[in-house]
Amino acid sequence: MKKYTCTVCGYIYNPEDGDPDNGVNPGTDFKDIPDDWVCPLCGVGKDQFEEVEE
């Protein structure tokens, strides 16, 4: 699974960790996160994230 970064604040969503504080379980691929999920640091939507090139 690929990591995604917030283009506004630099937060990196790692699917291995998920975002359990906001209802996203570890192992959840970015495409499977609910559309109303927002960046836990700055509050922007999923449309402000882009795939991390590794």
From Swiss-Prot:
One of its GO terms (molecular function) is electron transfer activity. GO terms for biological process: alkane catabolic process. SUPFAM superfamilies: Rubredoxin-like. Its cofactor is Fe(3+). Fe cation binds at residues 6, 9, 39, 42. InterPro entries: Rubredoxin, Rubredoxin-like_dom, Rubredoxin_dom, Rubredoxin_ET, Rubredoxin_Fe_BS. The keyword Metal-binding applies. Transmembrane segments: none annotated. Rubredoxin is a small nonheme, iron protein lacking acid-labile sulfide. Its single Fe, chelated to 4 Cys, functions as an electron acceptor and may also stabilize the conformation of the molecule. Belongs to the rubredoxin family. This is Rubredoxin.
